Amino acid sequence: MLRHRFAGRTQLIKTGRIIKMSWLHLPTDKIKARIPPVVSILFLLNGCVTDSVNRAPVSPSVPWHGEQQIQAGEQVRLSLSPQTEADLPQIDTAHSYQLPELINMAQLNNPDTRIAWQQARQAALAVGLTESLFLPVITASVVGGYQHSRTPLSHTIGNQSNLETNSHEVVPALVLQWLLFDFGQRGAIMKAAEQTSFAANMSFNSIHQKIIFDVMRTYYQYGAAQTRRVNTNEMLTNSQKILEAAEARRKQGIATTVELAQARQLVAQAEMNLVIAGNNEREARQMLYSALGIPANTQMKVDFPAFSTDLTPVDPPSPKAIEQALAQRPDVLASYALAKAAKEEISAAEADYLPKIYLAGALATGHGQFDIQGLPSIGQQTSASNILIGVTVPLYDGGMRAVRVQEARSRSDSAEDVFKKTRDDAAREIVVAADILQSATASGKAASHLVNTAGVTYDAALEAYKHGVGTITVVNEAANNLLTAQQMNTDARTEVLIAAANLAFVMGEMTRPVTLTGSD
């Protein structure tokens, strides 16, 4: 009599060891009754780690604002301010864009924001990966096979000279693996990922602040280039007035040929200066387009109001103001979070020295059939379930764990040094930016006074020349000095505006970021 027997066996690989589990036979109907609850549990587990991307900014066009607290001797306070994705603006050639509109356009179009946004999303997804380490791993598998054999008979039986057999088997199974306890290693890994995600969000905010500053800087420079062109055009008008006065004196027989040639030379010089000013204006416009992230061939109007900023003295920031600025600068917050993440990596590396407790189990059923030519089919169904708890204790690994701990401590020390350097550099930038603003304010006042005196000198020299008292040389010199004073005043005013924007940038006040309190 031929017999066919199915013996179910599976192998689980857990923490480097192979665990063999033999099946405990159970009735098939009990196995079928357990399948729906198991499937329901699987769907519930799949929904446990699906929202980690919510840690990232919701849009590449707006800075990140989150609600989170990190406790580790120091506290990061965040405020929730949800933002929505804005539509990309269409360039209206008839509209004159002001600075706030240009900043919004840059946040929507500049590729740096989208790059930083994707990096923040990747860091947030990494947090989701670490959270999944706390959940069990359930694997479903189905193994099936078919076998056909033909055996020649020594004697013919009836019309059959061969014995043919067929058999097939189907074995579905569910395997469970769950790490129950690891002395805080997974928790340390998750905390490190959370800090890294926070640092990525701060870097995203830093990119936004830099873009805002770049737009303001290029906007002011473009406005200064426009003002220089206006000043140069005014110089051309003044030189033409001087030429008219020289020609009138020439007709009266008072002016010489040299005076007339000098007046014409002044006009030609003014025309050349106007061409140069126009080129500089176009270059400044392209720099603004680059900061906005729009094509170079874009046609748009930019509204730049006349210089009306009051040049009031600026007091240097107090130590308390500097501390507050450091507590809200994104780069300082990012380096601080990375330093905390590096410390958590030390805890994760040290946990490799400790044992781990895990749970493993399986649930399977088998369906087989055996056919012999000329005989009725033989079918059988088997089922089995298994569950066990195991402990792994690392004994020797050739010093690999010690090297990992030393490496983690080295990275932590390096991250701490980077944080201190970033904080010190930021404080130095704030002091330097305040000094630059003070110097620019003083230069602006002096340049404004210079323009007034140069204008009076030019008017007096021109009137004197018209009445035959002054000389053409004095008038030309006064006109050139007036243009120089006007350009210096434009540059000084622009430096004041850029210096003020730079001070706000280095103090982290371009957006509304989170603040870090208690940092030392």
Give the location of each predicted region:
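Terminal intrinsically disordered/low-complexity segments used for targeting and assembly
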Residues: 2, 21-27, 33-105, 155-156, ...
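Short flexible linkers and secondary-structure junctions
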Residues: 49-221, 357, 361, 399-402
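Periplasmic alpha-helical coiled-coil/stalk elements that build and connect Gram-negative outer-membrane
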Residues: 49-50, 206-324, 436, 440, ...
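Small/polar, glycine/serine/threonine/aspartate-rich low-complexity segments that form flexible
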Residues: 85-95, 141-175, 304-315, 347, ...
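Sec/SRP-type N-terminal targeting helices
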Residues: 114-115, 131, 166, 180-208, ...
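Short segments within alpha-helical structural elements
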Residues: 269-294, 449-509
